[in-house]
Amino acid sequence: QYDHKIFIAGNHDRMFEDFPEKSMEIVRSYKWIDYLQDDWIKVGDDTQMVKIYGSPWQPEFHHWAFNLPRQGEELAAKWAAIPTDTDILVTHGPAQGHLDTSGPPYNEPNLGCPLLRNHIDTAETKPKIHVCGHIHGGSGYKFDGTTHWFNVSILNEYYEYVNKPVTFDWDPITNEITFVKFTDNE
């Protein structure tokens, strides 16, 4: 149904970090899937191209995959590598202050990455859409007038499937979104 299926790894995808060559061998066997790890792809046609950048990194969180020190230079460098002309940014974790509060029983605010938030806030051209997950209780959507922020976690803090997948149509010229399906807590 879709021309492109793009995904990134996350904190549970240790194979992609520990065995990247084998992981990519498996991914390449699925010709209809594009895996992005600190990389981008352009989709569309000659009249309308959209640049999508994806990255799996996150501030250190337990002993999971793709962890880097929260305020470290290496993590800052990952975000600095995001091209300035990115239309859609896909990261495993949220930017601090954007759909990054955990749900019960934790209820912790601002678990997102402060370095990612700073990078986006100070970018000359901000992404039109930022899609993330990771912080399960932050599942939802908000629009700040420039960027559409999505946390598309489908699990709650107990790893139960409680949120529906998100489906929307997006006009890259007007930056308007029409929801086809969204979570119950929109």
Task: Please describe what each predicted stretch is.
Residues Q1-Y2, Q48, I82-D85, K126, ...:
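Residue-level preference for short coil/turn positions at secondary-structure junctions
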Residues D3-F7, M24, Q96-E176:
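Conserved beta-sheet core of the metallophosphoesterase superfamily
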Residues F7-L115, I154:
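Conserved catalytic scaffold of divalent metal-dependent phosphoesterases
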Residues H12, K42, P59, G137, ...:
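Residue-level detector of flexible, active-site-proximal loop/helix-junction positions
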Residues W32-I33, W64-R70, Y141, Y158-Y159, ...:
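Generic preference for hydrophobic/aromatic residues in regular secondary structure cores
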Residues I52, H148, T174-N185:
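Short, well-ordered strand-loop elements centered on a beta-strand within folded domains, enriched
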Residues A76-W79, I88-H92, P114, N163-W170, ...:
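Active-site regions of metal-assisted phosphoester/phosphodiester hydrolases
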